[in-house]
C-alpha cells in the first residue's frame, strides 16, 4: 500500500484533495523517496534508551598532557602536515534563541567591532594551520533552512582568509516529522514536514553528498568533528590529534572536568566494555557522586562535542543503523483545512541520530581533558548560563579583542 492510500495519513490525504493532478503527481514522486520505516520507531521509542553496564574510563588529564606536550604535538603536527587531518563543522542550526533569523554562525560576538562566530572558529583553526604550515580541509554541514545563507555569508567575507579550495559545504539529510499518532505532517499542500536527522547523521550526509571521493583524494585519515556554538574550541588541535594517535585509539573526545556532580553534561565512560556517553539524566545519584581515592569524581569528565574519529572506522560503521531517538518537538504544519499552525507546545515527534551513539560504535576512545576556561564557551542563549554574555567574558579572558 502506498503511504497516501493509508487512511491514517489524514494530513497527506487532505492536501491531495486540495491539489491539482499535476501537484499530486509531483508530491507522490517525493513521497516515494522518503524512508517511511522511521515511523516504526514510535512504538520502539523506549527501547533505544535501555542502557548496559556503565564503568569509568580513565582520561588523559592536563598534567600528563603537559608532561608529554612535545611528544603529542609532534605527532599531531606530522599528521596535519602529511594531509591526514580534516575537520567537520556542524552548522545546520538557525540562531533563533539568539534573536537571529539566519545561521547561528553569523552571530556577531564582538562588542566594539564585528567578530562573527564563524570567523572566530576559523581564526582558531588558522592558529593551528599557521603553526603547521599546512591547511586542513574544512567541511561545513548546513541544513535546507540555512544552506544558501551560510554559503553566501562565507563568500561575502572571503572565507575569512582561508583558502576556498579547502572549504566544502554539504546539506544535512532530512527525515519526516509526525504527530503523536504517527500521522505525517505537511509543511504545505505540496511539501511534507521534514526536519534534520540529528548530529549523528553528519558522516552519512557527507557520503550522500558525494564527499567520500574528496576525502579519499585528499588522503584523510582523521576527522575532527565539532559544533558551531563553542567559540573557544581549538580545531584540528595538534596535541589532541597526537594524543589520540599515540594512544593507538581509533577515536578521541575532548572533555572538561565537571563543575559539580549534578552538572547537566554527558559523561564519557564505558558501557558493556565499549566507549560510551552517559547522559546526566541516565546517571544514578551513586554514579554521579562516586569519587576516587584522591577525591576526584569517578565519572568526572563531560563531553563538549569535539571528537576525533578514524576515517577508516567511520566508513566501516557507515552502513550500520544508528539508534533513532524519537524526540518530542514543536512542529509547524498545515491543519486538515490547510491553515498554517505554529504550535506553542510539543505536538509530535522528530527522529534524530546522535553523535554520542557514534562513540559507542568505536572500539576505543581516549577522553582528552581540556581546561574549561580556555576551550569551552558555548553560546546557546543571549543571556544567563552558556550565553553570549558568558562567552564574551571567556573570550576576553583568553586575550581575544572584542
PLM regions: where:
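Residues immediately flanking
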Residues: 91-92, 228, 311
Amino acid at each position: 500500500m502506498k503511504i497516501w492510500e493509508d487512511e491514517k495519513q489524514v494530513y497527506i490525504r487532505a492536501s491531495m484533495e486540495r491539489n491539482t493532478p499535476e501537484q499530486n503527481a509531483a508530491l507522490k514522486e517525493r513521497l516515494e523517496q522518503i524512508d517511511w520505516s522511521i515511523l516504526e520507531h514510535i512504538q520502539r521509542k523506549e527501547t533505544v534508551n535501555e542502557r548496559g553496564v556503565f564503568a569509568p574510563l580513565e582520561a588523559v588529564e592536563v598534567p600528563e598532557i603537559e608532561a608529554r606536550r612535545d611528544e603529542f604535538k609532534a605527532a599531531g603536527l606530522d599528521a596535519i602536515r602529511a594531509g591526514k587531518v580534516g575537520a567537520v563543522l556542524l552548522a545546520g542550526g538557525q540562531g533563533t534563541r539568539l534573536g537571529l533569523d539566519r545561521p547561528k554562525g553569523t552571530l556577531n560576538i564582538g562588542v566594539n567591532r564585528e567578530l562573527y562566530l564563524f570567523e572566530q572558529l576559523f581564526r582558531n583553526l588558522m592558529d593551528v594551520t599557521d603553526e603547521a604550515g599546512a591547511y586542513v580541509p574544512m567541511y561545513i554541514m548546513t541544513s535546507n533552512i540555512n544552506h544558501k545563507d551560510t554559503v553566501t555569508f562565507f563568500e561575502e567575507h572571503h572565507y575569512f582568509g582561508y583558502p576556498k579550495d579547502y572549504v566544502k559545504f554539504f546539506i544535512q539529510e532530512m527525515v519526516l516529522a509526525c504527530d503523536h499518532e504517527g500521522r505525517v505532517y505537511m509543511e504545505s499542500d505540496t511539501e511534507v514536514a521534514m526536519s534534520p536527522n540529528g548530529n549523528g547523521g553528519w558522516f552519512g550526509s557527507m557520503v550522500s553528498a558525494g564527499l567520500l571521493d574528496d576525502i579519499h583524494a585528499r588522503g584523510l585519515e582523521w576527522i575532527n568533528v565539532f559544533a558551531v556554538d563553542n567559540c573557544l574550541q581549538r580545531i584540528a588541535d595538534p596535541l589532541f590529534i597526537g594524543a589520540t594517535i599515540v594512544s593507538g585509539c581509533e577515536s578521541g573526545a575532548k572533555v572538561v572536568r565537571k563543575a559539580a556532580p549534578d552538572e547537566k553534561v554527558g559523561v564519557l565512560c564505558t558501557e558493556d566494555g565499549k566507549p560510551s556517553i552517559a547522559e546526566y539524566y541516565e546517571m544514578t545519584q551513586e554514579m554521579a557522586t562516586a569519587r576516587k581515592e584522591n577525591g576526584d569524581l569517578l565519572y568526572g569528565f563531560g563531553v563538549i562535542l569535539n571528537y576525533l574519529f578514524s576515517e577508516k572506522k567511520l566508513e566501516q560503521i557507515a552502513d550500520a543503523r544508528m539508534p533513532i531517538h524519537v524526540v518530542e518537538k514543536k512542529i509547524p504544519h498545515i491543519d486538515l483545512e490547510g491553515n498554517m499552525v505554529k504550535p506553542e507546545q510539543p505536538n509530535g515527534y522528530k527522529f534524530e541520530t546522535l553523535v554520542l551513539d557514534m562513540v559507542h560504535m568505536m572500539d576505543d576512545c581516549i577522553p582528552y581533558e581540556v581546561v574549561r576556561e580556555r576551550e569551552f564557551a558555548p553560546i546557546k542563549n543571549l543571556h544567563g548560563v552558556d550565553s553570549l554574555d558568558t562567552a564574551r567574558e571567556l573570550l576576553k579572558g583568553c586575550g581575544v579583542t572584542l
